[in-house]
């Protein structure tokens, strides 16, 4: 089975969402009569202000697979609280054998992230972040691990509410 890593493409529709295609794979199903070829696409969609969604789509044609993935990403969007274009705090995300470490960075650092993680932060609106990935480099696992870490992130107000303290006590 051949694998095609598609160049990350960005598209913006009239709804203001940013779309990036992370990968397109050619897949085959072996049946009695031979092989059936198909394509699997992985995409992310974000609004540039902390909302992010991931989708995967499969079809016989590449454009149909990409469209299915984009539609799923739009349906599965989650909100992540950002702080001045970076993350609230250091966070680790895991999915399968993929483990990603994401750290907030000061202004001017830029997005220091590899592969699929960079696409996620760009469509999400994060401008300064430092990341490191360990383990699996499979694009799907890396995207899921990144989203896992981002959804675990808490704001100071949420932490203060859990502990029954004021935000000033939490921030020091």
From Swiss-Prot:
GO terms for cellular component: small ribosomal subunit. Pfam families: Ribosomal_S5, Ribosomal_S5_C. The keyword Hydrolase does not apply. The keyword Ion transport does not apply. Keywords: Ribonucleoprotein, Ribosomal protein, RNA-binding, rRNA-binding. GO terms for molecular function: rRNA binding; structural constituent of ribosome. With S4 and S12 plays an important role in translational accuracy. This is Small ribosomal subunit protein uS5. It comes from Cupriavidus metallidurans (strain ATCC 43123 / DSM 2839 / NBRC 102507 / CH34) (Ralstonia metallidurans).
